[in-house]
Amino acid sequence: MRIISRQIVLLFSGFWGLAMGAFPSSVQIGGLFIRNTDQEYTAFRLAIFLHNTSPNASEAPFNLVPHVDNIETANSFAVTNAFCSQYSRGVFAIFGLYDKRSVHTLTSFCSALHISLITPSFPTEGESQFVLQLRPSLRGALLSLLDHYEWNCFVFLYDTDRGYSILQAIMEKAGQNGWHVSAICVENFNDVSYRQLLEELDRRQEKKFVIDCEIERLQNILEQIVSVGKHVKGYHYIIANLGFKDISLERFIHGGANVTGFQLVDFNTPMVIKLMDRWKKLDQREYPGSETPPKYTSALTYDGVLVMAETFRSLRRQKIDISRRGNAGDCLANPAAPWGQGIDMERTLKQVRIQGLTGNVQFDHYGRRVNYTMDVFELKSTGPRKVGYWNDMDKLVLIQDVPTLGNDTAAIENRTVVVTTIMESPYVMYKKNHEMFEGNDKYEGYCVDLASEIAKHIGIKYKIAIVPDGKYGARDADTKIWNGMVGELVYGKAEIAIAPLTITLVREEVIDFSKPFMSLGISIMIKKPQKSKPGVFSFLDPLAYEIWMCIVFAYIGVSVVLFLVSRFSPYEWHTEEPEDGKEGPSDQPPNEFGIFNSLWFSLGAFMQQGCDISPRSLSGRIVGGVWWFFTLIIISSYTANLAAFLTVERMVSPIESAEDLAKQTEIAYGTLDSGSTKEFFRRSKIAVYEKMWTYMRSAEPSVFTRTTAEGVARVRKSKGKFAFLLESTMNEYIEQRKPCDTMKVGGNLDSKGYGVATPKGSSLRTPVNLAVLKLSEAGVLDKLKNKWWYDKGECGPKDSGSKDKTSALSLSNVAGVFYILVGGLGLAMLVALIEFCYKSRAEAKRMKLTFSEAIRNKARLSITGSVGENGRVLTPDCPKAVHTGTAIRQSSGLAVIASDLP
């Protein structure tokens, strides 16, 4: 039965072939592919495969047989060889791609030999009879978009890979409308040249750009725009390309810049959806490029095969015999021998009208696409979104842009947000047993708790991601590329940064910050100095040495004045009873305030001790009164300060401020290599900070550290020869951690704050900001700081980190007092010995004794109080004899003494 059925089919096919003429069952077509067109070649193969395997009930099938040449180097010689190879194989049409180096060679051969070229490459300039342009022109759509935005001053970046058609159209329109267009060819630019150009344009306040480049160069330009931070709000880019969805714009989504472009392929049409299902099933090893969705050039390639297939069907229906093409031919013959049916092929190609992946495929008599529609897309927070369309009839038509704030919020709630942070104690740390946990549970710290609180208020799921390079975020001065957490946000790798990230102007230009969740400033960390040992005479410290000198001079001065007034005042002179054997009063009335007694009186008053003598005269008592008042105040002040000085241990710090650091060279100082502290010194215009920056920048070895932990370790190991400049909050935290050997000195150098960062234009900005404000007003932020700074501190209570600490007195505190006591006692013994010897010598002369005998008699008397050898009582020499007598009566200037001596 199967044999009979097969014979019937063959018989039917034979009759159909006779009816349709001698049309071949296998149609030879050519394929020319240049470098970096793997995906286009995959689309070419897939289209041919689907055509050859798809049943057609209405017409007899025919197979497309491709002859493909891949040209690695698209020069004239390689293109000529490939084209001649195709021509010699008897192809009826060639599908091929070209660039600016091969376009003229291909079009010349096609015109000379009447071989039609179907191409998805850029449209050629001028008229090419045998070239069918699958790619629509962007001129009309781009000019309509510029009119809509009312741009009259912008930058046009282009290369010559696609010719000058768009440049010519824009410059003509600029001349008509008075536009100011800066046209710049970027064909020979490298990464550095792009960045320099963008920086220069930014200095000129250029914010609007039209970019007309092929996909590879376009992607490179966009990467450089991101690297210099020009993808933020305020910038607008129009991409003169038909594959808006083919471009990687993830980083621009978070940046906030407005990006507009055109999309030729509508991925929502049934035909495209069906092809995509088949595309995803392709083996990536056999079909390179199938791992990504087809680009618009691949869609044009697919449509090109459909156009060729439809052309051959039309030729067969018209009973045009193309079989006389032959299997050989000399493409270099002189004169050229064109293909006879080439005109019919070219005419039929231009008459084709089909629905392909790129919409309506139709050509004019010049072989250019007509009656096509392209969509206009803009980049939104959720990705590319259609905002309108353009066609020849309606021109630019914009559709209503429905607000999608709610949709954006819902999209955030339905996915996991990446939170970038940095390993920095006490903000983010690994738990002790973190190996037992997964995800966010591995971490603990201030920022971990803060992220949890913010997520609760916003209602999102999040994933903590540690920044790979371990940096906060700074822009390289040469490459203009951001690193650290700022780079993670700028380049779209994270959506929130919750870390000790300082709010600065340069960062605010590329990312958004919430209200500060912590206030701080730059501070100085040094190694805690050893406690100073009190000096022997530390009891003198309560008063300055100048005051002590003044007290000594005051003491001497008061004693001299007291001596003088006592001498001149008659009331200080009084009469004494006469000595033995004398009658009447003494010729020299006594005065108690000699110079030595005056000194003794002043010293006793100063020491707040009593004295056997006191002034009798009014003038002397005035001197004594003011001296007592003086000593009262001085002694009270001294006593008040003495308690504090003797019971407080002091640590002498070699550095107390930034000025101290700047004016010395013995102690080195530095900051983090990448962060706001370094940026503060680099940009500062204050003389002290400029001097510090000059030193830090030129210091060898480098004083910049990669991490805070490295800086702290350097402080601890430097034996007081290195100071680390860091945020005050981190300084205070480390001061509370063992081994408790660092300390903060001086005040903060500036005032700033830490904020939660989001990419520019992110829908998370407002919810995050409100969450931080709520946490601040509820006191949660203060509780978190106390928890991680002081409650978990290892160096005692919060106030124990002060520089002075009260303690019990030690012997060293009062050693000087004991020294003075011992010294005074020793001095007294020495003076007593001198007096003993002096009086013994005088006694020896008076008693006609030898000095040794006088010494022995004095010693015997001093020890035993015994009588000497001659029966004389040896008594210590006294200035006056003591007598017992009646009361003294003085009358008329005479003294009468009654004595009871026999």
Curated annotation (Swiss-Prot):
PTM-bearing positions, type Phosphoserine: 862
Q: List the disulfide bonds.
A: 84-331, 740-795
The residues exposed to the Cytoplasmic compartment are 566-592, 612-617, 835-902
Q: Which cellular component appears as one GO term in the record?
A: dendritic spine
- Which coarse location class describes where this protein primarily resides? membrane
- Which residues does L-glutamate bind? 500, 502, 507, 676-677, 727
InterPro entries recorded: ANF_lig-bd_rcpt (IPR001828), Glu/Gly-bd (IPR019594), Iono_Glu_rcpt_met (IPR001508), Ionotropic_Glu_rcpt (IPR015683), Iontro_rcpt_C (IPR001320), Peripla_BP_I (IPR028082)
Which regions span the lipid bilayer? 545-565, 618-638, 814-834
- What's the disease link here? Neurodevelopmental disorder with or without seizures and gait abnormalities: An autosomal dominant neurodevelopmental disorder characterized by global developmental delay apparent from infancy or early childhood, mild to profound intellectual disability, hypertonia early in life, which progresses to spasticity and impaired gait later, and behavioral abnormalities. Some patients may develop seizures of variable severity early in life.
Q: Further remark, if any?
A: The postsynaptic actions of L-glutamate are mediated by a variety of receptors that are named according to their selective agonists. This receptor binds AMPA (quisqualate) > L-glutamate > kainate.
- Protein's name according to its UniProt entry: Glutamate receptor 4
Please tell me the species this chain comes from: Homo sapiens (Human)
